[in-house]
Amino acid sequence: MTDSKINVAILGVGNCASSFVQGLEYYKSEQDENGLISDVIGGYRVSDIEVVCAFDINKSKVGKDLSEAIFEEPNNTVKFAEVPNLGVNVKPGKVLDGIGKFVEDIIDPTEDSENVIKDLKESGAEILINLLPVGSDEAVKFYADCAIAANVGLSL
């Protein structure tokens, strides 16, 4: 096993992010690895993954701790794990494309942030996990460029 952490940033605090963050907490506290292909990969356990930064464009999520933001509407993922305060306030992203027609009337977008690269660097993130909605082509390109500039890997 390794003593080091994998510091990740989340791009898009929607239902997938909610399941991911809850899953991290669930498997950190459970001795049972049911549902995992393997409890150790490359010397790392689920408990070695730490979310250090998150971005979203929805005003109802930005500025809140990630543990709260993952349950904000329009998210509707079933709550299956208790998520303590993570000390990770959701940062504003940049509004480009990818806001679906079913949520465009629900989401109140933030003002664009020019600090994505700075936020990634300051957080110590090693990997930016892309959880943006399908159709976010321009947004993915923008955040890929930000990840490159911040020397952070990008998981599509």
Model-derived segments and their meaning:
Residues 134, 142-156:
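Beta-strand-loop-alpha-helix segment that lines the small-molecule cofactor/substrate pocket
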Residues 1-136, 140-142:
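N-terminal glycine-/serine-/threonine-rich beta1-alpha1-beta2 phosphate-ribose binding loop
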